[in-house]
């Protein structure tokens, strides 16, 4: 559910050994003209009309031969499509084509299907060759707007006279200080983030943090033992656990051995050594004193004489007690665990705590269809989710841009649907999307910010901390899928950490990868076995209904009139169920059927002009909305009959169908609360009607939205910008209080028609889910950057029962939520981020490569110079801030205002415990 409406040498196209390209030609040596081309994309002006902006592409010829006036085609992807592909009925399209014609070039859809974000620029009659040493700037009108560098065209590759294409690298330029580059429209009053703006917003100051708040999510209640400590000795401590907590004991043993020298032997025979960690169950455990047992609750006791006891209401409760214990181990122990100076002990404060979650559903969704993530990357993320007590992990494995799970009996889904490349007719694979297409050799990708590589960094390797030009140059995994065995291992790995895996197969829209794969299958069998060819076919090729999705597709919806559509879906779900059944530890809970982002009816038609719809007596005469009802009723039934509960996006209930269908029991996830779009209250409407709702609101819970408005940030911005504070401040039972400003910075107007939750409706809100869609997840580093520390804010809201009350500001100008943020930001700055810097995957069965640390976003500091004095603060008090007066050659820790009146240049940055730094920023005098 991701709206998207809204540098440099040529390198060789390389073959990828594990796949065959039998009918496609690929270059093995660079073209002598092409290998000297450089490209630069610039934003020029947003103030040229509604929903369009002006950009430019500069082609520089550094070679010895001219780039001729004909015979070449420059291909690229763009999430901001050229306006020239708009129809004649749209004046913007007419004007854009005239603009290009005056420059003697054209831009059109590149692929035969004219579907998606793939385009080609070609010279037309009158084009003047670009001679050696010359540059040519081509002005291009594009749709919507570009606020961030990663909105730029990407994945450029050039073909000469129909020969195999080769990658051409592009650089990107945007000026953060130029409103023409960063102001979406005249209505956009949201400023670009600056050091001065951050300085004003960073109102939290460093404060002491109690044990209750040293953990994320914070503990429900704590009874400290004043001044008492337990010295946990690795050589002495053992783990005492019954057989039914063997999994939890193994996990704890592995986690402690990662941090502290020692064996931490597991003792299940009830022998009591001198120092013990005891795990036990108490099915009657009541953590909040209301007289009833609390699912997933636990009691953690650290006693200087009796050791550590973790008592859980259930196995999950014991496991979450272990996570709390892990987080309470001092940061220095984490730091030294990755060195030759690994600690032999850990000193822990003595106390007793009780804890239990607010919501039963605490989730995260990861889209692996747009950019594939390896099994090992998934393992690491699952372990991190467990660390913060997340218990649901949704994997979007099937979408327009890729099918990522092997389905026995339908090998074409991954033979074709898990590959992207240069295939204009899509005979062997999907065409390239979003600049991620395997086959193009592009060097070594993410490099880290070069300005952070100085002597002062003491050799610490740079890590991704914002836009790098590699993102636009074939970074990303267009190819890849999980085998059945891979997925079984993922299920087991997650189950061992008390996380349920929820697969998402998105239908009837967002199904392009499946559709094209089944057309590939159809063509494979049509001449030899027509029955087999049609067995899983998903479309009516004669359907003349026309639609255009938010992601620019014209062919991504399966047809409900074909019985083969439902044969296909039944096969997919039955094979999926077999995978779950083969892993005894895995819970068979929900399966997500999608149902989102069908283009709005009126300007679009879905199936009304399909001959097969009219020929089928079951579907003949039905409207598109009625056909959707018919489809989703059967789709939900297939999921349910295979033993899964049916999850869907809220679109299924809000606008796709007639509103009169009975889909059976649904568990909807509502994403569309974008301020001003008119759907802000829909989650409450359906919770009040009795649906078990998972809140997934884009404005606060979409991790793939950029942290803030600045061209160097990564992500999207169609619903605004989302940082850790915005996730933390999310109010599940009063979402309207979340809406201070809209995505353009304008105050949100109160709507008296907004529906509020009833008391019964509150009971039907079963949890929260953070979403991470994959368009920009072109490396694991980027994935971690967008997820952390946003995830910590969502974890806090999903677990902690006590929300800050909504009250007026106090004498200091702060509300209860402000004060809660002050505490939480200190928790991150003083405790949580230090541990994320060094955390190791708890790898019980040696499944994950030896790795440690998380590439979380390091916040840029706030800074101003007032009367010659430099003042710096930080979003997370406790993080080190530094300044440089010699253009980054040396960095000085900041302790208080410092005279910089003599300095020609002043730079600031934040630095982590390991020496990683944020992006640097110059502060104007």
Kindly label every feature range from the protein language model.
Residues 291, 295, 303-555, 564, ...:
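Feature activates predominantly on carbohydrate-active enzymes
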Residues 645-868:
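Flexible, acidic glycine-rich loops studded with aromatic residues
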Residues 152, 158-335, 339-357, 647-654, ...:
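Acidic, contiguous N-terminal accessory segments
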Residues 58-66:
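Asparagine-centered strand-capping/turn motif at beta-strand->loop junctions
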Residues 28-51:
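Low-complexity, acidic Ser/Thr/Pro/Gly-rich terminal tails and inter-domain linkers that flank the onset
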Residues 549-665, 673, 677-678:
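Active-site neighborhood of glycoside hydrolase catalytic domains
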Residues 238, 819-925:
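Short, compositionally stereotyped local motifs that mark structural "simplifiers"
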Residues 52, 108-118, 127-190:
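Terminal connector regions
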């Amino acid at each position: 559910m991701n709206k998207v409406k809204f540098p440099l040498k040529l390198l060789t196209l390389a073959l990828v050994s594990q796949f065959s390209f039998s009918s496609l030609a690929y270059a093995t040596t660079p073209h002598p003209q092409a290998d000297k081309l450089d490209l630069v994309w610039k934003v020029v002006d947003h103030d040229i009309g509604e929903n369009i902006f002006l950009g430019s592409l500069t082609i520089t010829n550094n070679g010895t031969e001219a780039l001729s006036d004909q015979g070449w085609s420059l291909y690229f992807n763009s999430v901001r499509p050229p306006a020239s592909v708009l129809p004649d009925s749209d004046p913007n399209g007419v004007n854009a084509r005239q603009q290009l014609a005056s420059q003697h070039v054209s831009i059109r859809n590149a692929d035969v299907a004219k579907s998606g974000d793939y385009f080609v620029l070609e010279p037309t009659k009158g084009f003047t060759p670009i001679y050696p040493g010359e540059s040519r700037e081509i002005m291009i009108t594009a749709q919507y707007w570009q606020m961030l560098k990663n909105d730029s065209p990407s994945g450029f590759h050039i073909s000469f006279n129909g020969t195999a294409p080769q990658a051409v690298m592009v650089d990107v330029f945007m000026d953060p200080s130029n409103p023409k580059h960063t102001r979406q429209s005249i209505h956009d009053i949201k400023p670009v983030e600056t050091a001065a703006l951050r300085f004003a917003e960073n109102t939290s100051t460093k404060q002491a943090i109690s044990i209750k708040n040293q953990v994320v999510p914070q503990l429900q209640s704590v009874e400290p033992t004043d001044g008492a400590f337990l010295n946990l000795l690795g050589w002495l401590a053992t783990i005492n656990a019954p057989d039914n907590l063997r999994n939890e004991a193994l996990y704890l043993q592995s986690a402690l051995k990662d941090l502290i020298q020692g064996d931490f032997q597991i003792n299940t025979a009830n022998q009591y050594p001198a120092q013990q960690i005891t795990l036990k169950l108490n099915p009657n455990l009541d953590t909040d004193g209301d007289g009833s047992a609390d699912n997933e609750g636990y009691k953690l006791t650290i006693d200087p004489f009796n050791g550590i006891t973790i008592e859980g209401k259930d196995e999950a409760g014991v496991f979450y007690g272990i996570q709390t214990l892990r987080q309470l181990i001092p940061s220095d122990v984490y730091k030294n665990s990755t060195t030759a100076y690994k600690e032999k002990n850990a000193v822990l404060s003595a106390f007793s705590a009780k804890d239990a979650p607010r919501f039963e559903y605490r989730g995260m969704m990861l889209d692996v269809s747009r950019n594939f993530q390896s099994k090992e990357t998934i393992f690491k993320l699952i372990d991190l989710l467990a660390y913060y007590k997340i218990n649901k992990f949704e994997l979007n494995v099937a979408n327009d841009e890729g099918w990522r799970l092997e389905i026995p009996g339908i090998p074409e889904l991954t033979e074709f649907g898990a590959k992207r490349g240069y295939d204009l007719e899509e005979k062997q694979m999907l065409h390239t999307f979003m600049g991620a297409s395997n086959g193009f050799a592009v060097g070594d990708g993410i490099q880290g910010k070069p300005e952070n590589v100085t002597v002062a960094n003491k050799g610490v390797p740079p890590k991704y901390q914002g836009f790098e030009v590699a993102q636009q140059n074939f970074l990303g995994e267009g190819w890849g899928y999980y085998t059945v065995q891979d997925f079984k291992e993922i299920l087991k790995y997650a189950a061992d950490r008390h996380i349920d895996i929820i697969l998402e197969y998105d239908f009837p829209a967002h199904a392009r990868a499946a559709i094209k794969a089944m057309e590939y299958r159809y063509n494979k069998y049509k001449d030899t076995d027509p029955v087999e060819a049609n067995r899983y076919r998903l479309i009516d090729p004669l359907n003349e209904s026309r639609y255009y999705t938010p992601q620019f597709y014209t062919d991504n919806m399966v047809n409900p009139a074909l019985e083969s559509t439902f044969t296909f879906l039944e096969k997919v779900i039955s094979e999926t169920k077999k995978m779950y059944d083969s892993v005894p530890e895995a819970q068979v809970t929900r399966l997500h059927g999608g149902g989102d982002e069908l283009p709005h009816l009126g300007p679009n038609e879905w199936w009304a002009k399909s001959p097969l719809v009219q020929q089928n007596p079951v579907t003949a005469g039905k409207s598109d909305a009625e056909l959707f009802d018919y489809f989703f009723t059967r789709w939900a039934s297939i999921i349910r009959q295979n033993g899964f509960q049916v999850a869907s996006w809220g679109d299924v209930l809000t606008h796709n169908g007639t509103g009169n269908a009975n889909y059976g029991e649904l568990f909807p996830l509502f994403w569309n609360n974008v301020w001003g779009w008119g759907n802000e209250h829909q989650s409450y409407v359906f919770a009040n009607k009795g649906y078990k709702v998972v809140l997934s609101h884009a404005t606060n819970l979409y991790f793939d939205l950029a942290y803030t408005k600045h061209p160097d940030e990564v992500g999207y911005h169609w619903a605004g910008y989302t940082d850790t504070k915005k996730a933390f401040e999310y109010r599940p039972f009063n979402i309207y209080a979340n809406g201070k400003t809209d995505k353009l910075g304008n105050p949100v107007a109160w709507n008296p028609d907004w529906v509020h939750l009833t008391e019964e409706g509150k009971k039907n809100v079963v949890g929260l889910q953070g979403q991470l869609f994959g368009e920009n997840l072109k490396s694991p580093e980027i994935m971690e950057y967008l997820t952390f520390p946003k995830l910590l804010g969502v974890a806090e809201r999903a677990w902690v029962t006590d929300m800050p009350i909504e009250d007026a500001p106090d004498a200091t100008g702060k509300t209860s939520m402000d004060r809660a943020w002050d505490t939480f930001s200190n928790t991150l700055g003083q405790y949580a981020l230090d541990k994320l810097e060094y955390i190791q995957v708890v790898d019980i069965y040696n499944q994950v490569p030896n790795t440690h640390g998380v590439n979380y976003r390091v916040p840029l500091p706030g800074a101003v110079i007032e009367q010659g004095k430099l003042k710096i603060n930080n979003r997370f008090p406790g993080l080190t801030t530094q300044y440089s007066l010699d253009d980054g050659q040396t960095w000085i820790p900041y302790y208080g205002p410092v005279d910089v009146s003599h300095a020609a240049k002043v730079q600031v940055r934040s630095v982590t415990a390991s020496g990683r730094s944020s992006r640097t920023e110059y502060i104007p005098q």
